Amino acid sequence: YCPVPVSAMYMRPLKWILLFLLVFSVGTMWYVTFSSNNGIEHTNPMYFYEYEPIYKQHYLFTLREHSRCRDIEPFLVILVSSSPKDVNSRQAIRATWASQNFWWGHRILTLFLLGQDTGREDDAAALSVEDESILYGDIIRQDFMDTYDNLTLKTIMAFRWVTEFCSNTRFLMKTDADVFINTANLVKLLLKLNASENVFTGYPLIDNFAYRGFSRKTYISYDEYPFQLYPPYCSGMGYILDGKLAQRIYELMSHIKPIKFEDVYVGICLNILKVNISVPEDEQFFLHKINFDLCKYRHLIAVHGITPSEIIGFWQDMSSNTSVTC
């Protein structure tokens, strides 16, 4: 009898474990890669269209700031998608890139988009948002639940608010609360744009695959979206459009079945309206955070993935180093 070495006894199950992990990894990669290609090849946004306005949303405004545009002619309205508990981001934005009402003599108006708090402390959270609204007068809210899957409802609310209460704005920007905006450069860009009612620009996403993998956040089912590719759209981190186009999109939204991703949903509307995305000439929109560099941040318009403390720090650095040349 020849005893089996202890090391060999442990190696056998280890081999099987490694083999299983290898097969699982290959299988996962295959699924993620090829399942994205199983949808309908040619994207047809009219698939989502209904002749009757059956998708008109009837959520009620619980905070609406309906008089903000009554006595002014805004050049630009910036609507920031936020969540009830994200007070720090709103405070950071108010103290930094939304702190000035005028840039180059043009009136800028910034407001925040919220749904109802989903947490256990609903009453307390709602009360604090109400207090915040009284203090700053810059919160728009409807009575849907504030969840990731309801971001499209929040964007529909934004377009409805502009249409009903601020139809005189020249431009609209929809952005997120974790975005740093160089407001001066944003206004400069808008002043350079052609006076067209079809202007729509931001960080363009062209020929983006509909994701069918395991990440719930980016997954979309075939039932909800049966096509391989999304139509051209701009990332929801910050897109800008003509005020009249915003009203046309809102009117169309009543006919378009909402999908999970608000930026793709707006892209579907643009496609049906036959509006092309204007691709910025310079790289000024950043989908992912870039490290702070004074000259880079002086040149950009919007960068995504920035914390409230970074928004404040970056703004202070830019404001205190105006004499530095790039």
Please provide the spans of the model-predicted regions.
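Secretory-pathway lumenal glyco-enzymes, predominantly type II signal-anchor Golgi glycosyltransferases
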Residues: 1-326
